[in-house]
Amino acid sequence: MGKPQETILIIGAGIAGLTASRLPTNNGIPNIVFEASTPERNQGFAISLQEFGYSSLLAALGDLPLSNLTRGVAPDRQIGGTGWIDQALRDNRTGELLVAPDLTTMKQTIVRANRNALRHWIADCGEDELDVRYGHKLRRIEGKLGDITAVFENHAKYKGSLVIAADGVNSTTRSQILPNVIPETIPLIHYHGEFQVSHSAFDKLIRPHSGHSNILVGVGDRFNTPLSICNVTKTKVHLDWSYSRPVKGENDTLYRPNVPSEEAKQIPPALLEELDALSLAEPWKNFLNSESLKTHRVFHWTTRCVYITQDDARRAGEQGVVFVGDSWHAMPIFGGEGGNHALLDGVELANAIIKSTASGGKDGWDNVVKSYYAGAWKRSQEAVRRSTQRFFLLHRPAKEWKEISEKKKKPA
């Protein structure tokens, strides 16, 4: 079936694809990463990294300390921060603290990371530079495991032994190899906004409420409004907000799952009206209003989940394709675990490749694929279901939040 010594072709330069490239590169295993976009693409929002995700990556990179990661990726790294979050939930209409862990006994296990910074940090964690080729949009895959060719829209062709599909929820690779797997659209409204303020404005308007936490989570009556630090520079604090809620009936004007990409960047009047009617408390009301949104970059995000059966994974493997990241386990962003499983995918697949290569490749590519999916399939597919359920639980009625808060206050 071919020895695991030939070039690996990786489609997509997100955190899963870069992890799947960095670790083999550090072990002398040739691979090429192909990315459809330009090097300037922006994914500057922040994500939450959990211990099960980053600890595996740090171990695979040579037992690096957590401080190495936080110095490189924490949104507040330029002011000495470590990406810390308080894990608290507040009533976004009163500011009341509803749920919060005991900060005196809690160690930092969740790290906020700027996504752009994380991509660069992974790419830089080794002596040899990664071979990332931008402007390569996949057209099709030809061949089989051990002898496969990737053909791109710029007419470039590359041969390899294995294709790693790291090209996201709308994976071109998956749509060709497994056309029966169609992302499931979740009936949720999700708008995302980006803006920046001066340090003095941040210290006046947000810091009194957030403290040193990199995210200020506000929950309401079936809707959420988290405010998050994306990046801190010498002069500005870059932030984002989300407004999310379940769909209301069949004629919800804000539910536009198939909106064209350019139209998704436009602010619908119905959103402005809805935000102004929420009666938010500070600091949310200072930013989530029709006047402030005039200076924000606002995006409509469609929430989609992807499930792949074991048989689908096996069939794709026989055709020379293995999946990592959102291409096979996309899940809700807020309350999800997607970035962590993307890291874990890259680590576990790379470990299977490295192990097979160390044995002289006698196991073949088919056993690399089987070894990877033996653990990754159940882990990731369960996470999709868990994250989707958690998303709806985080959008519960205000009455239920109050009941939870009261129970937390009662002595054990």
Curated annotation (Swiss-Prot):
It comes from the Eukaryota. FAD binds at E35, A46, R119, D326, G339. Belongs to the paxM FAD-dependent monooxygenase family. Residues 1-21 form the signal peptide. Keywords: FAD, Flavoprotein, Glycoprotein, Monooxygenase, Oxidoreductase, Signal. Its EC number is 1.-.-.-. One of its GO terms (molecular function) is monooxygenase activity. Pathway: Secondary metabolite biosynthesis. It is an enzyme of class 1 (oxidoreductase). This is FAD-dependent monooxygenase nscC. Glycans are attached at N68, N92, N170, N231, N251. Its cofactor is FAD. It holds the Pfam family FAD_binding_3. FAD-dependent monooxygenase; part of the gene cluster that mediates the biosynthesis of neosartoricin B, a prenylated anthracenone that probably exhibits T-cell antiproliferative activity, suggestive of a physiological role as an immunosuppressive agent. The non-reducing polyketide synthase nscA probably synthesizes and cyclizes the decaketide backbone. The hydrolase nscB then mediates the product release through hydrolysis followed by spontaneous decarboxylation. The prenyltransferase nscD catalyzes the addition of the dimethylallyl group to the aromatic C5. InterPro entries: FAD-bd (IPR002938), FAD/NAD-bd_sf (IPR036188).
